[in-house]
Amino acid sequence: MSVIFHENPGTSLGSVVPDTNTSFERESQLSVKTSPEWIDELFPNVSFIDSPTHQVIRGFCRDVFVYRLPGGFRVRYWDAVILVPNILFLLFLILKCGSVIRKLRTGNSPVLRAFTLLVYVSTLVNIIRCAYSMTLSMTDGLEQTVDQTLWIIIKFFYLTAEFCALTFGLLFGHLDNGKSILIALLGTLLVSIPHTAVQVIIEMKIIDNSWLPLTYFDIQSDGGFLFWVFSSAVLALVYFFIMCLPLVCCQKYTKLPSKGSFLIYCMMMVVLNVLQSMGAALILFKSSDGLCFVGVSTYVYFVLYPPIIYFTFLRKKLKTPPNNTSGLFMYRKHKDEQGSGDLPDSYYPRFSGLTSPSYDDLFDYDRDARFTHYDISRNEYVQNPHYNTYSTPLIMTSVETAESTVTTRTGSDDYAHHRDSMLSEPSTGTTTRHLKGLGPQGSLVFEDDPSSLTSLRM
């Protein structure tokens, strides 16, 4: 998202233009009544081209940038329609401020803090820019320079927020402390600062262009639009490539967001940047139709981008209650105590059963099947007559894989055969054995086994 219109003093940079149609068309060389010859040649049989309706649409897209509110106010329509939604969203953020602060204090997520800061800062800077622009007469050179500077600042903040959102979204699993967040932020600044520097050079006319040929790279005429077309097209390709990442083999390098909201966010940014690039290209070739593409995409960008960030990355996270035990199930590669390096993944076990709702679900996973049998004569399941009179393992274990030290065999053929054999055996007179704990090498220790108790103490 770069300049809006290089001859529009209220939205970007350029010479001051009076609020009249004739002056605007003469200075900008964009006519709302006729289309360029290349459009007539491209669409020779389209009656909508240069029709009265088409001229009205072109005129509206042009007037909204420069016309001011009636009643003697110096406020432009463009500033007003951007300011009002941002103020409403800021009021919404203020109402949510208490819950946001509590969530940030109880949680330990630097990414959440970074996203929250991006939303609040972007909204405040946009409101300050709109409010200050309303007080400018735009006829004084100093005030015009201040307005230009504010537009560059707000676009710098928004571009930085874009790259931060992409970085945090794609590297969420790797950003677990403030240092990693700072490194990611510095990486985004390496892209946004050069982009803004080129904008400053073009819009402030810092470089003397007398030595440049009169081509599309002429800074005073079309250089800004060419840069706009190129930057918007590159951003659209970046977002489109990110949308295609789940289709390529890159899962081992980055943890891609699985939420559909992130893909919707990328899709919206692709559409906005494509519209920006198309609009700038049309204006570059002297077609006033580009003003409509530019106006719609720019308005959506400066009004809806902070809310999009909030509802995509923050809303669900801020609504969830703090969970102090979530750190127990966070994956973190263990370090060897002797300092020899990382331990292999198969060294430490993973107990998927720990996430079950109750303790019995882990250790007594097939209770009904073990203590009942099917009676053919009665055509129903009845309690086993040898209930609590036979010895049975508390849980089936397996060390066949390094994936876990405890592996249930629910539903397997071996377990079904073992269960049926136990149910068919007569009672041996043994009583229920109570589990005391785990002994060496994962063996089960029972209360009535003295040798096992001795090994447990060891």
UniProtKB/Swiss-Prot annotation:
Q: Which GO terms describe its cellular component?
A: plasma membrane
* Keyword match Nucleus: no
Q: Which domain of life is it from?
A: Eukaryota
Signal sequence segment: none
Which InterPro entries does this one have?
A: TPRA1/CAND2/CAND8
One Pfam match, given by its short name, reads Tmemb_40
Q: Name one GO molecular function term.
A: G protein-coupled receptor activity
Per the record, membrane topology reads:
Multi-pass membrane protein
Where are the annotated segments for Disordered?
Answer: 409-458
A single GO BP: G protein-coupled receptor signaling pathway
User: Where in the cell does this protein reside?
Assistant: Membrane
- Where are the compositionally biased (Basic and acidic residues) regions? 411-422
Identify the glycosylated residues: 21, 45, 323-324
Presence of the UniProt keyword Membrane in the record: yes
Give the UniProt keywords, A-Z: Glycoprotein, Membrane, Transmembrane, Transmembrane helix
Segments passing through the bilayer:
81-101, 114-134, 152-172, 181-201, 225-245, 263-283, 291-311
Record-stated family: Belongs to the UPF0359 family.
Protein name, per record: Transmembrane protein adipocyte-associated 1 homolog
Its taxonomic placement starts with: Eukaryota, Metazoa, Ecdysozoa, Nematoda, Chromadorea
